[in-house]
């Protein structure tokens, strides 16, 4: 049995879909739903007030970067192209070729390791847009930016070129105001101040996004504990997660959203998609869209008889290329052209609640 009789781009995409159904969903999709354009030029990606995103060599320090797998051309579309690939090993190929029938019980075993590798490819492609979305929501010192490394140069997609977002929609807490000072800080006051500031601009915040490490500040906070005690006649009370979520919602009209999903960065280290020591006030409804463009595989591979192409989800391209040899070889690629728009960024507010001063 030839490998391309049992393994193709459609089966890889199906396996990845089944694998994804068992994982924590990507929260960013709630505010940046996926959409697709044929092509995709940077001029189509909009920020607040209909302004386009700008791309330039980055002058932002200590910002997590995404590594483009192909050259990023500032003169052309200015869009980063991400591609990862793998080759099915000769040993696996021979094992599958020995199998005579699709009903053979050894077929599933032979394919399992292949699907594990291809699932990792597709999962890696899904990580890219979520990192982008969370970079915008967390900001870098108040600036919504996405950093890309291409050909040894770091570029930044800057969604706040005039600095107006950082001026009006971001605050860095200092001194005893930092939430890490659990005895003196006033997180309920901070959240209400930001919510009311948005409300004066006609924007209604419904949620406050953070991870569990930041949430711990609230569990230990004196203002919150006093607020809980004021609602109870007993001298002592256990402060648990649900109680804190409830009092924050009651006092600020904001629902806490905890997001602890992690990814492995290019250095092999685990990172939170939404970082420590930040909180973002968010509205109901969309903030923008996650735009996917046309990949080179989509444009050209369909014309090649030895290349099989399927779209996974909205915009990730899964392609398999078979070389009949000898020896026979199959290569699998997952690729994407992707960037979020952020038209409703003025509906958000970001606090940096702790920093090393």
Outline where the language-model segments fall.
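Acidic/histidine-enriched, beta-strand-rich ligand/metal-binding domains
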Residues: 177-213, 219-221, 225-229, 235-239
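Assembly/oligomerization interface modules of large self-assembling protein complexes
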Residues: 31-99
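Intrinsic-disorder/low-complexity loop/linker signature
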Residues: 50, 142, 151-152, 163, ...
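Sequence/fold signature of self-assembling virion shell proteins
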Residues: 221, 225-357
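N-terminal alpha-helical "arm" segments
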Residues: 1-43, 341-357
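Long, contiguous amphipathic alpha-helices that act as assembly "spine/axial" helices in icosahedral shell
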Residues: 80-165, 187-213, 328-335
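Short, Φ-rich (hydrophobic/aromatic) sequence segments
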Residues: 16-17, 190-195, 340
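Hydrophobic alpha-helical segments and helix pairs
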Residues: 5-23, 154-186
């Amino acid at each position: 049995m030839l490998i391309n009789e049992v393994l193709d781009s459609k089966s890889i995409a199906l396996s990845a879909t089944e694998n994804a159904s068992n994982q924590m969903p990507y929260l960013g999709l709630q505010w940046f739903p996926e959409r697709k354009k044929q092509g995709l030029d940077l001029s189509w990606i909009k920020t607040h007030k209909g302004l386009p995103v700008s791309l330039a060599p980055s002058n932002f320090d200590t910002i997590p970067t995404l590594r483009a797998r192909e050259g990023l051309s500032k003169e052309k579309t200015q869009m980063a192209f991400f591609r990862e690939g793998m080759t099915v090993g000769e040993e696996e190929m021979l094992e599958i070729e020995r199998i005579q029938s699709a009903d053979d019980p050894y077929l599933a075993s032979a394919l399992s390791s292949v699907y594990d590798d291809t699932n990792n490819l597709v999962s890696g492609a899904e990580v890219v847009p979520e990192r982008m979305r969370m970079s915008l929501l967390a900001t870098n010192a108040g600036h919504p930016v996405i950093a890309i490394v291409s050909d040894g140069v770091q570029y930044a997609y800057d969604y706040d070129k005039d600095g107006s977002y950082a001026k009006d929609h971001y605050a860095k807490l200092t001194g005893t105001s930092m939430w890490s000072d659990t005895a003196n800080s006033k997180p309920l006051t901070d959240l209400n101040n930001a919510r009311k500031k948005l409300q004066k601009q006609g924007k209604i915040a419904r949620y406050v996004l953070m991870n569990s490490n930041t949430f711990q500040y609230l569990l230990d906070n004196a203002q919150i504990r006093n607020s809980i005690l004021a609602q109870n006649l007993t001298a002592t009370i256990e402060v648990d997660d649900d109680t804190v979520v409830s009092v924050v919602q009651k006092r600020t009209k904001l629902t806490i959203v905890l997001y602890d999903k992690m990814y492995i960065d290019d250095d092999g280290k685990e990172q939170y998609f939404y970082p420590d020591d930040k909180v973002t006030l968010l509205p109901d409804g969309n903030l923008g869209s996650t735009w996917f463009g046309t990949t080179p595989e989509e444009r050209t591979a369909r014309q090649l008889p030895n290349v099989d192409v399927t779209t996974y989800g909205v915009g990730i391209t899964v392609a398999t290329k078979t070389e009949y040899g000898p020896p026979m070889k199959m290569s699998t690629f997952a690729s994407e052209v992707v960037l979020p728009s952020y038209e409703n960024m003025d509906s958000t507010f970001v606090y940096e609640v702790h920093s090393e001063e």
